[in-house]
UniProtKB/Swiss-Prot annotation:
One of its GO terms (biological process) is defense response to virus. UTP acceptor binds at residues 107, 123, 179, 229. The keyword Magnesium applies. The record marks 229 as: Important for uracil base recognition in acceptor pocket. A motif (Pyrimidine specificity motif (R/Q)xW in donor pocket) lies at residues 328-330. It comes from Yersinia aleksiciae. GO terms for molecular function: ATP binding; metal ion binding; nucleotidyltransferase activity. Keywords: Antiviral defense, ATP-binding, Magnesium, Metal-binding, Nucleotide metabolism, Nucleotide-binding, Nucleotidyltransferase, Transferase. This is Cyclic dinucleotide synthase CdnE. It catalyses: 2 UTP = c-di-UMP + 2 diphosphate; UTP + ATP = 3',3'-cUAMP + 2 diphosphate; UTP + CTP = cyclic CMP-UMP + 2 diphosphate. The (R/Q)xW motif controls pyrimidine nucleotide specificity in the donor pocket, while conserved Asn-229 is important for recognition of uracil in the acceptor pocket. Its EC number is 2.7.7.-. The keyword Ribonucleoprotein does not apply. UTP donor binds at residues 109, 257, 274.
Length: 379
């Protein structure tokens, strides 16, 4: 029998993964008219818009199990490809219009394939190569410059803003964010955050010359504070650990991001970022996350275990680093409340899954029942 609570969540998840009615309207127009309207390869979505995804036929009806399985899956690769192509459109315009030597990189959820929206935002780093910051303790050889990197980044930001307004006259270029520009609308079917920056050559990068060890320097335009970040090391370390567990980390991250989105839709916002959630699950047990085909509920079991342990031992949680080691995941005591909210969402859904498996509506999930879920095949 369908579960009304999960019927609503499943419908929201379908919309999230395939797009809102307005997004689909533009997509459909692009397909039928074969217009270049932000859907860089309109044929990519021709099938996706109308066909169901494989997870929609797994489990029984609109159940907690079907919801969990669906929440773990990547969005269709054709949506993700269009996200990258939208970033490439921005890159091409900036390359042509700016008198700067620039490098471009995509960071965030999309390159990690942990986004849960078909029409996901894209984070595009634009990196001015005329100068860089470097760790003086490294072994590299550099020539000093009299230029202030903060001025270089702010000038790049202003030039990029003007170039984007010229290249995409019907789009909105928002210059209010302290660290990035945001371009939306017009012919673009993805919101793109454009992050002006320069390279930061870490000690490790100077030694090994691996790009994952190379960082970037960005600026808070309001305070002129330099912010050093290592997005490629974040991506590399999560990918490497995910490879150890048959994709289990990505599935757990998507699951938690979906629960967070549904919590907001149901009236309770959870103030943890996508970056925080990904960093949190990086500390999960890879062996526990490892699973065979059709045994994905093992991912839910480990997600439940880790969140409950950290919620009950917050002093341990506050010692955990983000994957690239640049800061702690939880930097303030108030984050405990947000972790508790997310944990409660997991606890609620894992109990519903257990009840669907056992057929006993009074069952409550506990760690001693983990094998019931781990051994359950979901076709």
């Amino acid at each position: 029998m369908p579960n009304p609570a999960f019927s609503a969540r499943i419908e929201r998840m379908k919309l999230r993964r395939k797009g809102t009615s307005d997004q689909l309207r533009v997509a459909t127009e692009s397909i039928s008219n074969q217009r270049y309207d932000g859907l860089e390869k309109y044929t990519l979505l021709e099938d996706v818009l109308h066909l169901s995804e494989s997870w929609e036929n797994r489990g029984k009806g609109d159940s907690a199990i079907r919801y969990i399985i669906g929440a773990m899956q990547p969005v269709d690769a054709r949506y993700t490809e269009i996200s990258f192509e939208t970033a490439s459109r921005i890159e091409n315009q900036l390359s042509k219009k700016l008198a700067h030597n620039l490098d471009f990189r995509v960071q965030g959820s999309v390159p990690l394939d942990i986004h849960i929206k078909g029409f996901s935002d894209v984070d595009l780093l634009i990196i001015d190569t005329q100068m860089l910051m470097y760790d003086v303790n490294g072994g590299g050889s550099y020539s000093p410059t009299s230029r202030d990197g903060r001025d270089v980044i702010i000038e790049l930001r202003e030039a990029a803003r003007d170039a984007l307004e010229m290249a995409f006259p019907t789009a909105l270029v928002d210059d209010n964010n302290a660290k990035s520009l945001r371009i939306t609308g017009g012919s673009l079917q993805r919101e793109v955050d454009v992050v002006p920056s320069i390279w930061w050559d870490t000690k490790e990068y100077q030694s090994m010359k691996r790009e994952e060890d190379r960082g970037v320097t960005i600026i808070d335009k309001n305070t002129r504070e330099r912010i050093y970040n290592a997005p490629f090391l974040h991506i590399k370390r999560i990918k490497d650990k995910c490879d150890q567990c048959n994709g289990g980390i990505r599935k757990s991250i998507r699951l938690l991001k979906t629960l967070k989105a549904d919590s907001k839709d149901e009236g309770s916002d959870i103030d943890l970022s996508s970056y925080d959630i990904a960093s949190l699950m990086f500390h999960a047990d890879a062996n526990n996350l490892n699973h065979s085909t059709y045994y994905e509920l093992a991912v839910l079991v480990e997600t439940h275990r880790l969140l409950n342990y950290l919620s009950q031992n917050y002093e341990v949680a506050m010692q955990l680093d983000v994957p690239n080691g640049t800061r702690k995941i939880f930097e303030k005591p108030e984050s405990h409340v947000e972790l508790l909210k997310l944990t409660e969402m997991v606890n609620s859904v894992v109990t519903e899954v257990l009840r669907e498996i056992t057929g006993r509506p009074t069952d409550f999930y506990a760690n001693d029942k983990c094998d019931v879920l781990r051994k359950q095949m979901v076709y």
